[in-house]
From Swiss-Prot:
Superkingdom field: Eukaryota
Descriptive protein name: ATP synthase epsilon chain, chloroplastic
Organism: Oltmannsiellopsis viridis
Alphabetically ordered keywords of this record: ATP synthesis, CF(1), Chloroplast, Hydrogen ion transport, Ion transport, Membrane, Plastid, Thylakoid, Transport
Keyword S-adenosyl-L-methionine listed: no
CDD domains membership: F1-ATPase_delta (cd12152)
HAMAP family per the UniProt record, alphabetical: ATP_synth_epsil_bac
PANTHER family listed in its UniProt record: ATP SYNTHASE DELTA/EPSILON CHAIN, ATP SYNTHASE EPSILON CHAIN, CHLOROPLASTIC
Subunit structure: F-type ATPases have 2 components, CF(1) - the catalytic core - and CF(0) - the membrane proton channel. CF(1) has five subunits: alpha(3), beta(3), gamma(1), delta(1), epsilon(1). CF(0) has three main subunits: a, b and c.
NCBIfam families, sorted: ATP_synt_epsi
Pfam families reported for this sequence: ATP-synt_DE, ATP-synt_DE_N
Function: Produces ATP from ADP in the presence of a proton gradient across the membrane.
């Protein structure tokens, strides 16, 4: 038995297909979902969502949101989603290096929060390109 996943952003339905397994970046860590999973709703952090079909794994950078798991259907609502095909590897690598440096140099509370947010976004995109 498989899972039906639908990933939606404010702009579009980003992904809608049958999968065998999904790993979600929740606020408390990664959470795997297989068929016949118990119903739940969970908040998603900025990170990499992994989707497995029979053939291989697909990585998607998600920028926070939530997921609903119910009766082998997973509905994922996120602020933004990007796949490997839509990310420029050079730009992602540069953004990751810049965000890391900015986070290390942040001093004030507000500056640290903003730098951490930018770092998490850049890291997710960098991880998706497989660097």
């Amino acid at each position: 038995m498989s899972l039906q996943i639908c990933v939606m952003t404010p702009d579009c339905i980003f992904l809608n297909k049958e999968v065998d397994e999904i790993i979600l970046p929740t606020n408390t860590g990664q959470m795997g979902v297989l068929s016949n999973h118990a119903p739940l709703i969970t908040a998603l952090d900025i990170g990499v969502m992994l989707v497995r079909t029979q053939k291989d794994w697909e990585s998607v950078a998600v920028m926070g949101g939530f997921a609903l798991v119910k009766q082998n259907q997973i509905t994922v609502l996120v602020n933004e989603a990007e796949s490997k095909e839509t990310i420029d590897p050079q730009e992602a690598e540069e953004a990751f290096a810049t965000a890391k440096q900015t986070l290390e140099q942040a001093t004030g509370q507000k500056e640290k929060v903003e730098a951490n947010f930018a770092f998490k976004r850049a890291r997710a995109r960098y991880q998706v390109i497989g660097a």
